[in-house]
Amino acid sequence: LVDFDSKYGHRNDVMGYAKCLEELDAFVPEMVSALKPGDFLVFTADHGGDPSDESTDHTREYVPMVAAGPGVWAGADVGSRKTFADVGATVAEHLAVPSLGGTSFLGAILRD
């Protein structure tokens, strides 16, 4: 799960990158089914990227973020965030620990 961007994305290996994404997609239902009430899972990355771009540098894409689990709204839209710290603030609020910055969007993704 961790290395497919450096092995395929930054190497412009579109087919290898696609294969790894398909493997991850196949594993998601197993991860989600292991969640208990009150849990949620956040999928994200440190940057967006287009493995078909000629450059091996980061490209223009936004950072992806998907949340899943019991009590999470399917298709919740948190819009474009100004900082990645918002993900940390959201997780911190859910865990009831102090946030180091950012603005939580927990209320936008959890059902009542």
Where are these regions (language model features)?
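Feature captures the catalytic ectodomains and active-site-proximal regions of enzymes
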Residues: 1-112
